[in-house]
């Protein structure tokens, strides 16, 4: 092999190794997992809503899923997200699972609609994920390839949307693994900072956004918080964006909305 050929081979190998080293960072996928407990007039201690919105067995019309500001409908109508998967859930507790793809980055949002009467299971699964437990795989297949998402305890951001059932009952705390990085969580439920704090401390999670009073856990607030997380904003910026979104739809005043949300401990 002459010197010129050797140099060309060396440069080709160097370029290949450089690309190989960069590829994981460029192609890494981030996952947001959202646990939605469907509103249920019969099985939850909520202020009753119209029957159609409060039927915990009917996700298509439910206040927190299929209604105008429910998670599925609101994200499906967003210009930032594309619905790529919608099927019945993997267990009887989950009536529907939807996956949304962020249009400009490799980010996926997996949302599970839990039967209203299964709110205890929804909370247990949320806290398990917050603790980094029960990681699962979800395969998304199109005509060209298969993408495997790590969900549950393997998700990068975990959120709960629904009634704060810890006002009604308690469950056994779920302990996170010591030494693991703290997982950011969003809890959109009434007065969640007070009621969820003991559980999230045991789980070893980091509260990115939660609440300090009664509120409507609708999807515009969730989207604002996730948008901030995608943009790598700090907790206070995410809190401000969430408050702006909440005030836009609830007309409660910007200061009142800001006081309704908190970040960190």
Regions found by a protein language model. Name each.
Residues 22-85, 89:
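Boundary/activation segment at the start of structured domains
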Residues 75, 79, 130, 134, ...:
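Sec/Tat-exported extracytoplasmic proteins
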Residues 1-11:
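Bacterial N-terminal signal peptides that target proteins for export
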Residues 148-228:
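Catalytic cores of nucleophile-dependent amide-cleaving enzymes
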Residues 59-64, 68-151:
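Functional beta-strand-loop-alpha-helix junction segments that form "active/interaction loops"
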Residues 9-20:
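Bacterial N-terminal signal peptides
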Residues 33-42, 112-114, 161-163, 213:
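Short loop/turn segments at strand-loop or loop-helix junctions that form parts
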Residues 236-265:
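Caspase-like cysteine protease fold
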């Amino acid at each position: 092999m002459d010197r010129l050929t050797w140099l060309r081979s060396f440069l080709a190998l160097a370029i290949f190794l450089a690309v190989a080293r960069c590829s994981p960072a460029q192609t890494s996928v981030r996952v947001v997992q959202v646990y939605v407990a469907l509103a249920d007039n019969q099985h939850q201690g909520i202020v009753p809503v119209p029957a159609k919105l409060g039927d915990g067995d009917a996700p298509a019309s439910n206040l927190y899923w299929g209604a105008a500001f429910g998670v599925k409908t609101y994200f499906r109508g967003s210009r930032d997200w594309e619905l790529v998967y919608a099927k019945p859930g993997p267990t009887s507790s989950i009536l529907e699972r939807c996956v949304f793809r962020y249009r400009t980055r490799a980010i996926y949002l997996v949302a599970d609609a839990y039967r209203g009467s299964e709110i205890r299971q929804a909370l247990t699964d949320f806290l398990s994920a917050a603790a980094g437990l029960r990681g699962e795989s979800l395969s998304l297949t199109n005509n060209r390839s298969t993408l495997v998402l790590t969900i549950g305890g393997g998700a990068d951001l975990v959120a709960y949307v629904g009634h704060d059932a810890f006002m009604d009952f308690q469950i056994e705390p779920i302990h996170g693994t010591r030494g693991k990085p703290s997982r950011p969580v969003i809890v959109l439920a009434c007065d969640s900072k007070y009621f969820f704090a003991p559980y999230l401390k045991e789980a070893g999670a980091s509260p990115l956004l939660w609440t300090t009073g009664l509120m409507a856990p609708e999807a515009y607030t969730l989207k604002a918080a996730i948008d901030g997380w995608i943009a790598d904003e700090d907790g206070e910026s995410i809190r401000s964006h969430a408050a702006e979104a909440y005030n836009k739809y609830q007309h409660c005043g910007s200061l009142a909305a800001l006081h309704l949300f908190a970040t960190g401990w």
